[in-house]
Amino acid sequence: MPSFDIVSEVDLQEARNGVDNAVREVESRFDFRGVEATIALNDANKTIKVLSESDFQVNQLLDILRAKLLKRGIEGASLDVPDEFVHSSKTWYVEAKLKQGIESAVQKKIVKLIKDSKLKVQAQIQGEEIRVTGKSRDDLQSVMALVRGGDLGQPFQFKNFRD
């Protein structure tokens, strides 16, 4: 029986490349000359720290970062940015987390979405991914379109497609 897995992963190498591109653009922009503005990726806990001298500049840096990550194939929804920025002495910063894996609440929504579609497929939650099996390839492709179309708050990838 054909099957595939629904996952939500961020390629850390592409994230590193996107951060490097954003840093290069910040260094060359006129409005950031002479200003303490940094963007740094922490591989260990999968966060990106954005630091600047004002909250407005932090927002500008986040916009630059999102644009560069999007060019590298990482959607903006996979970046979890808190609403509040942290202010310490003369700098503002925010630590944005890269979403890895699918949370259990979102997994349940996906399984419910698949079951409500009345397609002849089965969905099983396996750790941080969802295995979908069915008799026909067309049903599996319909499930892929359904999951992409459903507004669930994060991007999904499909892997391990087997016949």
Curated annotation (Swiss-Prot):
Single GO cellular component term: cytosol
Transmembrane feature ranges: none
Keywords, in A-Z order: Nucleotide-binding
Any one GO MF annotation of this record: nucleotide binding
Cross-referenced InterPro entries: DUF520, UPF0234-like_C, UPF0234_N, YajQ-like_sf
Function according to Swiss-Prot or TrEMBL: Nucleotide-binding protein.
Family, per entry: Belongs to the YajQ family.
NCBIfam families the record matches: PRK05412.1
Listed name of the protein: Nucleotide-binding protein YajQ
Native organism: Salmonella paratyphi A (strain ATCC 9150 / SARB42)
Organism lineage: Bacteria, Pseudomonadati, Pseudomonadota, Gammaproteobacteria, Enterobacterales
Gene transcribed to yield this protein: yajQ
